[in-house]
From Swiss-Prot:
Cellular compartment(s): Cytoplasm
A molecular function (GO) term: DNA binding
This protein's UniProt keywords: Cytoplasm, DNA replication, DNA-binding
Protein purpose: Trans-acting protein required for termination of DNA replication. Binds to DNA replication terminator sequences (terA to terF) to prevent the passage of replication forks. The termination efficiency will be affected by the affinity of this protein for the terminator sequence.
GO CC aspect terms: cytoplasm
Entry coiled-coil feature ranges: none
Protein name: DNA replication terminus site-binding protein
Primary subcellular site in the record, as a coarse category: cytoplasm
Domain of life: Bacteria
Cytoplasm in keyword set: yes
Gene: tus
Length: 309
């Protein structure tokens, strides 16, 4: 497929996403809103976009106000839709839930509508990340040449739809991206970097090359069977824990956007019990269960690379 054809499909798919999101917004507003609760988080400014989040103050919104914020959030796809001071790199998150009354027919209709939107979003992401054939650094410029100001994360982010929950509780999750590597795999990566000398501010090309050589020597000095692990922290994320009474099970969802909960009164479902979201405080985290961590020693800080002792 030619690059021109791919761009045509990219634009066409994105237009469909916009159209289907608008139709979903209209459709939801035709249904009876049983309960709605969303939690707005502080705006992240451009100056603070890389700063760690030690505290997050939450503001709750209820009812029709919550619904309006949620429907606008689903369609927030461009930086032109937000304040000039707001970071375009930090994810815009609005945890919460909208609960609508449905019957068997309208439930199926909304399920199909959300499924179609999520399929389009997945297709759009596949075009950008795979079909374009571009490295990650070049994708940004390519996408924004054709869709100026697009917030790609918001375009990729799928909607979460659930049916007949009994309770919904919100909280925070601290996670790490973890990847296990062998010594030889790390050496191979460092060798590629050494073969392509460059400067990385604040280091000159020569200083960076020297730094890479030291890192290579440190890894080469380890036993070949050494267990290496990248453990990169991810900024704290809002989550939702959903309890289904009939199935007697709990399901946890990431909750960057309001969940759409369909309450089927034809089947006797009732309004769920919805909890709040506490302010986040990194110094006051209570772990429900924290397994004993494997002893790790940091060996290359810039890569968050550890070796198991």
């Amino acid at each position: 497929m030619s690059r021109y054809d791919l761009v045509e499909r990219l634009n066409g798919t994105f237009r469909q996403i916009e159209q289907h999101l608008a139709a979903l917004s209209d459709n939801l507003q035709q249904h009876s809103l049983l309960i709605a609760s969303v939690f707005s988080l502080p705006q992240v400014t451009k100056e603070a976009e890389h700063a760690p989040l030690d505290t997050i103050e939450v503001t709750q919104h209820l009812g029709k106000e919550a619904e309006a914020l949620a429907l606008r959030h689903y369609r927030h796809l461009f930086i032109q839709q937000q304040s000039e001071n707001r970071s375009s790199k930090a994810a815009v998150r609005l945890p919460g839930v909208l609960c609508y009354q449905v019957d068997n027919a309208t439930q199926l209709d909304l399920e199909n509508q959300v499924q179609r939107i999520n399929q389009l979003k997945t297709t759009f992401e596949q075009m950008v990340t795979v079909e374009s054939g571009l490295p990650s650094a070049a994708r940004f410029e390519w996408v924004h040449r054709h869709l100026p100001g697009l917030i790609t994360l918001n375009a990729y982010r799928t909607l979460t739809l659930i049916n007949n929950p009994a309770t919904i509780r919100f909280g925070w999750a601290n996670k790490h991206i973890i990847k296990n590597l062998s010594r030889d795999e790390v050496l191979s990566q460092l060798k590629k970097s050494l073969a392509s000398p460059r400067s990385v501010p604040p280091w000159t090309r020569e200083q960076w090359q020297f730094k890479l050589e030291r890192e290579y020597q440190d890894i080469a000095a380890l036993p070949q069977q050494a267990k290496l692990k990248i453990k990169r922290p991810v900024k704290v994320q809002p989550i939702a824990r959903i309890w289904y009474k009939g199935q007697q099970k709990q399901v946890q969802h990431a909750c960057p956007s309001p969940i759409i909960a369909l309450i089927n009164t034809d089947n006797g479902a009732g309004v769920p019990d919805i909890g709040g979201l506490e302010n986040y405080d990194a110094d006051n985290i209570q772990h429900r269960f924290k397994p004993q961590a494997q002893p790790l020693r940091l060996i290359i800080p810039r890569l968050h690379l550890y070796v198991a002792d």
